Design a protein with these regions (language model features):
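Negatively charged
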Residues: 1-180
Length: 180
């Protein structure tokens, strides 16, 4: 089942009740809410993403989204641009989220200018090939926990990964393999 672009471009959508959605057989959620400019909050904690393989651009350009709950998501493979340009996002509930076999982190959190803290420590990033601008322009980000991230020689680019993360106070990258 594909939910690709289901609500993409619904620029005037302010409220969305999808509490009865059964997502247990959904494989693609890419671009699902892309460009939903007027949504301010979204609770997807009931989504079963066990079979979902593609999350790219899922929330990109949700410019007014302030609160997002994706607790218990099973992220895997391609999460490129997942939260790209969610400028006003302040509350991102990632509790219980598992991230396994992630391959693409390009622009995942880029331009999330209001996020102050992220704990992604348990994410499996051993198969990541690109971290191109993953956190770029996260100007309010003060704490980023990725100290357990272990990359491999598959990682070929870290171009501007932390570009303009001007509020970051400390960062432990000792487990990143930068030989790729």
């Amino acid at each position: 089942v594909s939910f690709t672009k289901m609500f993409s471009g619904c620029t005037n959508l302010t409220n969305l009740d999808i509490s009865n959605f059964n997502t247990s057989n959904v494989v693609y959620m890419s671009y699902m809410f892309s460009g939903c400019n007027k949504l301010t909050s979204l609770n997807l904690s009931h989504f079963d993403t066990t079979k979902t393989n593609n999350f790219e651009f899922m929330f990109q350009h949700c410019n007014n989204l302030e609160s997002l709950n994706i607790s218990n998501f099973k992220l895997k493979n391609n999460i490129r641009c997942l939260f790209y340009y969610c400028n006003l996002l302040k509350e991102l509930n990632l509790s219980g989220v598992t991230a396994t076999n992630i391959t693409n982190l390009q622009w995942t959190f880029a331009n999330c200018k209001n996020l102050k803290s992220l704990d992604l420590n348990d994410w499996d990033v051993q198969n990541v090939t690109t971290m191109h601008q993953t956190f770029s322009s996260c100007t309010a980000l003060e704490t980023l926990n990725i100290s357990n991230w272990k990359t491999s020689d598959k990682l070929t680019t870290m171009y501007a990964t932390f570009y303009e993360c001007s509020s970051l106070k400390q960062l432990n990258l000792s487990n990143l393999d930068t030989t790729g």
